[in-house]
């Protein structure tokens, strides 16, 4: 949530009220396992989002509501928009987590299934570990050294928000959610704008065009030279 304070300020200056929240296991939300990106059930993400929006909507009578969601948030928002009654008029999905990058998909999915079968879902996926500050010169998130340096400083001062790599169970649950998207997306009835980063390395965009076409009312926009964090990128 802290990462988006600049963006929230920009919207506020344009006359919008802004609701930000951390998904469970991220930011200041409670960790299921310390440091690890872990989850019990994917539907908990969606239920959490629905409850937060429902309670906020009950307090304030807004004539119009919009969603701007990034990465994992975009995947969760897609399920929310498809499965819940809401008053959202339009949505923007930035670098949507509609694909898990895998060098060897068949092998990797077998490994994930095996780890789950042997009760090892709580372990970090291979190659991942505890939180490390972002490398300002070699990272796949953003070209903006200023913003990445600021985020490193925020993390350095607030150990409670540190988040390491994902667990096998987290990847397993997200993979299942992504595989079900062809049945979920057609139920999203509002207009959707999808922002795709040209230099994307964090999520897999291989099927993004096909998935975008499944939305009843959607258009996509390629952001030139942008890395994954489109909304946290270098100013032009």
Locate predicted features.
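Conserved alpha/beta-hydrolase
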Residues: 8-34
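Alpha/beta-hydrolase active-site loop
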Residues: 39-57
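Alpha/beta-hydrolase fold nucleophile elbow
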Residues: 60-71
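Alpha/beta-hydrolase-fold enzymes
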Residues: 72, 76-162
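Active-site nucleophile elbow and catalytic-triad environment of alpha/beta-hydrolase enzymes
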Residues: 165-184
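Short beta-strand/loop motif that positions the catalytic acidic residue
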Residues: 188, 194-196, 200
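Conserved alpha/beta-hydrolase "acid-adjacent" motif
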Residues: 201-207
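Catalytic histidine-centered segment of alpha/beta-hydrolase-like enzymes
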Residues: 226-236
């Amino acid at each position: 949530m802290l990462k988006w304070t600049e963006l929230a300020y920009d919207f506020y200056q344009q006359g919008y009220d802004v609701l930000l929240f951390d998904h469970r296991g991220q930011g200041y939300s409670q960790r299921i396992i310390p440091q690890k990106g872990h989850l019990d059930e994917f539907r908990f993400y969606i239920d959490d989002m629905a409850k937060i929006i429902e309670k906020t909507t009950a307090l304030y009578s807004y004539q119009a509501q919009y969603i701007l969601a990034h990465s994992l948030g975009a995947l969760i928002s897609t399920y929310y928009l498809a499965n819940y009654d809401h008053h959202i008029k339009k949505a923007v999905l930035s670098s949507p987590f509609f694909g898990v990058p895998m060098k060897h998909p068949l092998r990797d999915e077998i490994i994930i299934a095996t780890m789950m079968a042997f009760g090892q879902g709580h372990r970090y996926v291979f190659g991942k570990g505890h939180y490390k500050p972002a490398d300002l010169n070699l990272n796949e998130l953003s070209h903006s050294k200023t913003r990445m340096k600021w985020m490193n400083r925020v993390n350095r001062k607030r150990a409670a928000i540190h988040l390491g790599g994902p667990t096998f169970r987290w990847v397993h649950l997200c993979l299942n959610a992504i595989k079900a998207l062809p049945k979920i997306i057609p139920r999203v009835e509002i207009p959707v704008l999808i922002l795709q980063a040209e230099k994307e390395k964090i999520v897999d965009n291989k099927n993004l065009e096909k998935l975008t076409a499944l939305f009843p009312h959607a258009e996509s926009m390629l952001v030139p030279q942008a890395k994954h964090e489109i909304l946290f990128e270098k100013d032009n």
